[in-house]
From Swiss-Prot:
Domain notes: The C-terminal domain binds 2 Fe-S clusters but is otherwise mostly in an intrinsically disordered conformation. The N-terminal domain has structural similarity with S-adenosyl-L-methionine-dependent methyltransferases, but does not bind S-adenosyl-L-methionine. It is required for correct assembly of the 2 Fe-S clusters.
Residue ranges of the region described as Disordered: 93-118
Pfam families, alphabetized: CIAPIN1, DRE2_N
Family (UniProt): Belongs to the anamorsin family.
Positions of the UniProt region annotated as Fe-S binding site A: 253-269
Protein name: Fe-S cluster assembly protein DRE2
Reported function: Component of the cytosolic iron-sulfur (Fe-S) protein assembly (CIA) machinery required for the maturation of extramitochondrial Fe-S proteins. Part of an electron transfer chain functioning in an early step of cytosolic Fe-S biogenesis, facilitating the de novo assembly of a [4Fe-4S] cluster on the scaffold complex CFD1-NBP35. Electrons are transferred to DRE2 from NADPH via the FAD- and FMN-containing protein TAH18.
């Protein structure tokens, strides 16, 4: 089977122990245009394939004259590398040159097992995912996409054409032979030279203009009336029955046993407002209770800081905490003279 383009032979590892079969395959191809690679070395990444090089990639059968071993080694990554090595319009063939996915004309093969059929079907799906297509003869072909071309999108074409038509129609009434008839102060129209075009005044390099009239493909206002798209009124989404339903508290907002109820972040069930109102009420009650305990500037109060029934025994009670014992009833009070009366005036200790 002689070929004119470059050919890549992919051999399973079992064929290396049968050199006579491998030599038979090599004799049918031009040696200077044929490359031979072992599938196991490709699968382990020991060798690489050049991109867009081969016109034909030929899968060889194993020692059992089937493609079972070849299909088992061709995983998705390896198939993609093989497809990338094909040139545009290149073909992927097998040794028997049979249509892919078919064992024979009746769909049966005496030498193939159930596992072989599954691998064959998997291989067929993978090569399609890799970008190959079937031609009229049932061969796998890499499509020639060709050079990609940028296609300009004409946005707001109808609106621009309408504005252009209106502009030309209005300018035809005023512009004649390159002049514009403008009314003078005495009521007589005087010709005024028309504005110079961009051909006479080219745009300086690096200067751009923004076209604010471009609607970027949005339909014009006149087309909105003819549009079949219906606008939804958000006020009609909920009726009175929906508004009157009881709000179901989410499980994460429910307090755990023995803990205070806390509102979650971005609370929408009303618990946050309820807790804030409760805290304000408690704060107002506490402030009101503190108001009754405040003393005026002219009011005096006598407070006995000593513990009832407890008397100091160290004799240093009036010297301060540094000299007092642990059980002293005057701990926390400043030093004082024995027998001096202690008074509180506006929360200041007066000795």
């Amino acid at each position: 089977m002689a070929t004119t383009g470059r050919v890549l032979l992919l051999s399973p590892p079992s064929l290396s122990s049968h050199p006579e079969k491998l030599n038979t395959v090599l004799k049918s191809h031009t040696r200077d245009k044929t490359d031979l690679q072992m599938l196991d070395r490709l699968a382990h990444g020991l060798v690489s394939l050049p991109e867009s090089t081969y016109d034909i990639v030929l899968l060889l059968t194993g020692a059992d004259n089937t493609l079972a071993e070849t299909h088992s080694l061709l995983n998705r990554e390896l198939i993609q590398r093989v497809v990338h090595s094909l040139r545009p319009a290149g073909k992927l063939r097998n040794r028997e040159n049979k249509p892919w996915g078919l064992s024979d004309g009746n769909g049966n093969n005496a030498n193939s097992s159930r596992r072989y059929n599954d691998d064959e079907q998997r291989f067929r799906n993978e090569v399609i995912l890799a970008g190959l297509v079937f031609d009229d003869k049932g061969e796998l072909l890499k499509p020639d996409i060709g050079a990609q071309q940028a296609i300009p999108l004409k946005l707001g074409r109808r609106r621009k054409e309408k504005e252009k038509t209106d502009t030309l129609a209005s300018s035809a009434n005023y512009i004649t032979n390159g002049t514009v008839d403008a009314p003078a102060s005495n009521g007589i129209s005087a010709p005024i030279p028309a504005a110079k075009t961009t051909e006479n005044n080219p745009v300086p390099p690096g200067v751009g203009f923004i076209d604010f009239s471009d609607d970027f493909g949005m339909p014009a206002e006149d087309d909105l009336e003819d549009s079949d798209e219906e606008l939804i009124d958000e006020d009609e989404l909920l009726d009175e029955d929906d508004m009157g339903r009881q709000i179901v508290q989410p499980p994460e907002c429910r307090p755990k046993p023995g803990k205070r109820r806390r509102a979650c972040k971005d609370c929408s069930c009303g618990l946050s407002q309820k807790l804030e109102a409760k805290d304000k009420a408690q704060r107002a009650t506490a402030d009101k209770a503190l108001e009754t305990m405040k003393l005026g500037s002219s009011e005096l109060a006598e407070v006995d800081f000593t513990v009832q029934g407890k008397v100091g025994s160290c004799g240093n009670c009036s010297l301060g905490d540094a000299f007092r014992c642990d059980g002293c009833p005057y701990i926390g009070l400043p030093a004082f003279k024995q027998g001096e009366e202690v008074r509180l005036l506006n929360n200041d200790v007066q000795l």
